[in-house]
């Protein structure tokens, strides 16, 4: 019972940290690409650390909650992207946890996430009419930058993990 409480408290702490990091963009105005790569990498690192630290797939709840925060902050223009991003985050976290012992498989996690986000975003864009510029920007944001931020997040999480 004690271990369950510890895991729950750790999970809540990681969720709070992720939401605070996600809110940096509200306090410190960064250019779009810097915002995406910097904050995205930090959030990916927190998601990875949360699942490694708690040793539980329950940590994937963080990946499901973060897109709601992004929508409420005005970072997502469509509410329909919340489940797409949540699914991508949860699959990314589960993949990285499952294959944490294999570096090659570990770094396939960002590819899985980018594939889900890119495919899901394009499905949403096919259903919802948006100006071309907005649609292209969303498609771009959900493509290769997700691979970069995912890999950087894994590296950052590994550095922090070794110091814990």
Regions picked out by a protein language model, each given a short descriptive name:
Residues 1-164:
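Loop-helix junctions at membrane interfaces
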């Amino acid at each position: 019972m004690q271990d369950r409480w510890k895991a729950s408290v750790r999970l809540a702490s990681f969720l709070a940290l992720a939401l605070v990091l996600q809110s940096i963009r509200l306090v410190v105005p960064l250019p779009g690409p810097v915002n995406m790569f910097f904050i995205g990498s930090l959030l990916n690192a927190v998601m990875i650390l949360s699942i490694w630290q708690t040793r539980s797939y329950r940590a994937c709840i963080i990946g499901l909650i973060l897109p709601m925060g992004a929508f409420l902050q005005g970072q997502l223009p469509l509410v329909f992207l919340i489940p797409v991003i949540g699914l991508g985050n949860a699959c990314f976290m589960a993949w990285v946890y499952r294959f944490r012992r294999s570096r090659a498989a570990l770094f396939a996690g960002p590819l899985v996430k980018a594939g889900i986000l890119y495919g899901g975003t394009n499905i949403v864009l096919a259903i919802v009419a948006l100006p071309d510029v907005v649609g292209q920007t969303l498609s771009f944001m959900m493509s290769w930058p997700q691979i970069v931020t995912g890999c950087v997040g894994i590296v950052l999480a590994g550095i922090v993990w070794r110091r814990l």
